[in-house]
Amino acid sequence: MSRLTLALDVMGGDIGPRITIPASIKALEKDPMLSLLLFGDSQQINPLLEQVPSALKERLRVCHCSRVVENNQGLSYALRHSKGTSMRLAIEAVQKGEAQGCVSAGNTAALMGLSKVLLQPLKGIDRPALISLLPTMDGGRTVMLDLGANIDCNANNLYQFALMGAIFAENQLDLVFPRIALLNIGIEEIKGYKSIREAADLLTGNSSLNYIGFIEGNLLLNGKADVIVSDGFVGNIALKTLEGAAKNVISLIKGKSRNHLLKPLFNWLIKLLFKDSYQRLQKINPDQYNGASLIGLTSIVVKSHGAANIEAFNNAIHDAALQARQQIPEKILAGLQK
């Protein structure tokens, strides 16, 4: 494990430092080779560090800034008024080489916009995409992109997403020749938008890619594909639907015993009978898993859920560290040049 520095926008998210600071400390405890730059309001940050052991404090630095990109700011406004904000300064730290990656739970559009401007897309990539790993019902994982960075995509955009997703899957999942599918409303060749059908033709024409055809929404988690590609509009809706369904089922299971006199026994039986299913549902519960990466840039940027809890934001930090150590941008660039 190599030494690594990450820049964190600790003011981002629905709660801010009360979540991001404990998560940062947890990340330092788990990763002895990790150092963190904490960008945010020192008056809010420092009290949360008072009980932190000095050995951990040596691996973090508070970078004070009083300005924040608000969640309700539109993209153009956020970009024009981003100077001196915790989000922009964290990304600039990566741009300057002071950190090897950035993590933020802040305004998604602003994070993507600033990252594109300051870090630049890789040569050969027109648009970066949001990518994440999802659990499958057979116990494995699948890569899915785009999850919201690009609402409208042409065939070449989708083709590039597939290339990046395949390289990401090879490294994150240790796969050879990962199976690629396009998310569509049917599996027949005539189905879907023109851009999807044209992307299918491009993928079919590349013998170095293992394109297996279209996949429908009801099969996203069945393990049929290792990489699932869509535009950001469809991908974001699909992801939020999966997350919402998982949370609702988990709440339903827990709620059955809410007023039961034998609640402890009932809870034990639920865990025993539905242990495997419950654990798999938890993996797509945004409270448990977290972190979508903005792939296709020259550096690592991970977007955490705005409503992330401590464990979830810690997972986003872990994802950023892993991708930086795996040199994902460099491997994508090398793959594009083959």
UniProtKB/Swiss-Prot annotation:
Transferase as a keyword of this entry, yes or no, is yes
Q: Origin, by domain of life? A: Bacteria
For this protein, the record's Gene3D superfamilies field holds:
Isopropylmalate Dehydrogenase (3.40.718.10)
Q: Name one GO molecular function term.
A: phosphate:acyl-[acyl carrier protein] acyltransferase activity
Where is this protein primarily located? cytoplasm
Annotated GO biological processes are: fatty acid biosynthetic process; phospholipid biosynthetic process
Broad class of enzyme this protein falls into: transferase
Question: HAMAP family annotated for this entry?
Answer: PlsX (MF_00019)
Q: How is the subunit organization of this protein annotated in UniProt?
A: Homodimer. Probably interacts with PlsY.
Q: What is this protein called?
A: Phosphate acyltransferase
What organism does the record attribute this protein to? Mannheimia succiniciproducens (strain KCTC 0769BP / MBEL55E)
Please state the gene responsible for encoding this protein.
plsX
